[in-house]
């Protein structure tokens, strides 16, 4: 199943007054596996502080929040919820391509080369989906 979806807040008391809607860009679901993808486009895919490239904090907080709230929906049932920040590739020397395990969930950061024929872009997206289905193999470029 591939779709954009709303992710409910995991509220202890059920009171969600003034909380924003969590809307994923893409959610892939297959059996007990879920991959939430948030697509981003920036002139700079990383931020630089003190000559060190780091991920945009707000983006990482956002995908982590989506994943942890979706993860809580499963309760004690066997499941795997992962998240991915998917950036459009820029001409910068540093391009994010990392996977982290955070509080029991896989969070990946990838770049997508949009400077290709559509068939190559489709191949990159298919590689992401296949990697998700088969233990997260790395996705290729054009």
Where are these regions (language model features)?
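Catalytic core segments in nucleotide and nucleic-acid processing enzymes
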Residues: 1-142
